[in-house]
A protein has these predicted regions:
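Gly/Ser/Thr-rich phosphate-binding loop
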Residues: 137-194
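Conserved ATP-binding loop and adjacent catalytic segment of the adenylate-forming AMP-binding
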Residues: 171-214, 224-228
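Conserved AMP-binding A3 loop
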Residues: 16-43, 50-52
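Conserved pre-ATP/AMP-binding loop-to-beta segment of ANL
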Residues: 3-20, 54
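AMP-binding/adenylate-forming core of the ANL superfamily
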Residues: 208-236, 251, 306
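Conserved C-terminal "lid"/linker of ANL adenylate-forming enzymes
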Residues: 290, 302-304, 316-358
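AMP-binding/adenylate-forming catalytic core of the ANL superfamily
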Residues: 232-325
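AMP-binding/adenylate-forming
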Residues: 33-40, 56-133
Length: 358
């Protein structure tokens, strides 16, 4: 889907839009969402970040998914000048920017992408991979450093990327988003650079959060979601003091992992994200932790890696992980499966008859 296609859908007489989930934890799903709730979400984000009519925005995410759609809706609702590039791993590269187009929703006319880019972008959204790649190339890093408000979603921010983001000037506000397709993009933000950098997400004023008996985050966001949403994210809540809190309420949260990313192996509970975080500084090749059913252990942890030297990978695991966290199987693949939005695609891995070597 390109911008023209989406605008035709947005401007038709239907009051709903068809969206697709990314499929990072299973098969992608279709769902219909109300345009009015998308408008609400757009206004909430723009108001919080102080985005004004006539400001510039940068679209480098696929319009097939909610993140790209919402970036466009924000531009329409707040009358922004929108620069569009083809979704890719290096959206700030010369090659990508040379093909950029622009639409001025403030004056309802076309405009020069080059002129807007020269002035600097006021608002952009990217996935972690795009940010990481941009920070790795001096010319792209310089351009990234001139984006006034950068929101990062669609995947976890690992320690290495977080450290790089902390080196950006405080004048550039970099945020990690929390949300999903069902909440029409994000319902909470946490700062990634400057003195306010934190691991705690702060919900918007119109959003309330709690945890259920299983420890999963429950979201009450009536402006964007008609019913309370019970997530699969295991969360911890914290009442912030007045100096730390934003807006009208003081409850913040942090995500410890996903309920469906919990491996129960021989009575030991292993959180997939924690294992990956411990290994990431020591494994250079892309990898992921997943699980499979096992007659003896119930479930067992499996490490999937693009590294062909699985003996070395296993050695690192035994050195860096607690004994019962060490994967029981190691598999080589040519490419770690990813969704179109840049998330690791764990769902259905063992149903695809991938040839394994352990």
């Amino acid at each position: 889907m390109d911008l023209k296609d989406f605008l035709e859908i947005w401007e038709n007489e239907e009051d709903r839009v068809l969206v697709h989930t990314s499929g990072s934890t299973g098969k992608p799903k279709e769902m219909w969402v109300e345009k009015d709730k998308m408008r609400n979400s757009a206004r909430i984000t723009c108001d919080f970040l102080g985005i004004q009519s006539g400001d510039s925005a940068f679209l480098c995410l696929p319009l097939d998914y909610i993140a790209g759609k919402m970036m466009t809706v924000r531009s329409i609702e707040r009358e922004l000048r929108l620069v569009c590039v083809e979704p890719c791993g290096h959206p700030l590269s010369n090659e990508a920017l040379q093909q950029a187009t622009a639409v001025d929703f403030h004056t309802s006319s076309s405009c020069s992408a080059a002129t807007i880019l020269a002035e600097g972008i006021d608002f952009a959204a990217m996935v972690p991979m795009q940010v990481f790649n941009s920070l790795s190339v001096p010319e792209e890093r310089e351009r990234l450093g001139r984006i006034k408000n950068l929101i990062i979603g669609g995947g976890a921010i690992d320690e290495a990327l977080a450290a790089k983001l902390m080196t950006l000037p405080e004048e550039i506000a970099v945020w990690s988003t929390y949300g999903m397709t069902e909440t029409l993009s994000h319902i909470a933000l946490r700062r990634l650079n400057g003195p306010d950098a934190s691991e705690w997400y702060h919900p918007f004023d119109s959003v309330k959060v709690e945890v259920n008996q299983e420890g999963c985050l429950v979201i009450d966001a009536p402006l964007v979601c008609a019913e309370k949403l019970v997530t699969n994210d295991i969360a911890e809540l914290k009442v912030m003091d007045t100096s730390e809190s934003w807006g009208s309420h003081r409850v913040a949260f942090r995500i410890k992992g996903r309920k469906d990313f919990l491996i129960c192996s021989g009575g030991v509970k292993i959180q997939i994200e924690e294992v990956e975080d411990k290994l990431r500084p020591f494994l250079q090749s892309p990898f992921m932790i997943t699980k499979k059913k096992d007659e003896k252990f119930g479930e067992m942890a499996v490490l999937v890696s693009e590294d062909v030297d699985l003996d070395e990978v296993e050695r690192v695991c035994k050195e860096q992980l607690p004994k019962f966290w060490v994967p029981k199987q190691f598999i080589h693949v040519d490419k770690i499966p990813m969704t179109e939005t840049g998330k690791v695609k764990r769902g259905g891995f063992f149903e695809k008859n991938i040839t394994c070597c352990s």
